[in-house]
């Protein structure tokens, strides 16, 4: 059975940051088994516009997204400091509480940092100066 991986899309998402979906959606080895289903989720079912301008129609809204997913991926972009992004924090908390995989790219990782989700885990993301702009308090180890 394929596992669902949900990619969170906000308007202004970095479409190149969705590269991970390609690796998950096809078999890594030619003629190999495809283990994942890639789906998109957004605040509503309305069209989402990334930085590159293509229109993306999400599979699910935050209200009707499935509960039986394996991973939640926050794609970077320029709207992670918006009120729209704040709707994602409860989704991340619920995913982590249920021991689901949560991953983020670029400003998605900064969003996780700014909400304290990465306080106790090693992670990569934007540089220290960028994180300070987000108001992130951290300890370097």
Write out the residue ranges for each language-model feature.
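Active-site-adjacent pocket-lining segments in enzyme domains
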Residues: 2-14, 18-20, 24-44, 54, ...
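A cross-family phosphate/adenosyl-ligand binding-site feature
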Residues: 51
């Amino acid at each position: 059975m394929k596992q669902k991986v949900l990619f969170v899309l906000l308007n202004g998402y970095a479409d190149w940051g969705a590269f991970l979906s390609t690796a998950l959606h096809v078999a890594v080895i030619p003629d190999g088994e495809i283990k994942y289903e890639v789906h998109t989720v957004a605040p509503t079912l309305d069209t989402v516009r990334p930085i590159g301008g293509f229109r993306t129609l999400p599979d699910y809204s935050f209200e009707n997204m499935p509960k039986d997913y394996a991973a939640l991926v926050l794609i970077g972009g320029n709207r992670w400091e918006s009120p729209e992004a704040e709707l994602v924090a409860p989704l991340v908390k619920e995913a982590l509480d249920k021991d689901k995989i949560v991953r983020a790219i670029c400003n998605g990782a900064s969003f996780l940092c700014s909400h304290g989700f990465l306080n106790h885990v090693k992670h990569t993301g934007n540089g220290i100066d960028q994180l300070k702009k987000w108001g992130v308090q951290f300890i370097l180890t």
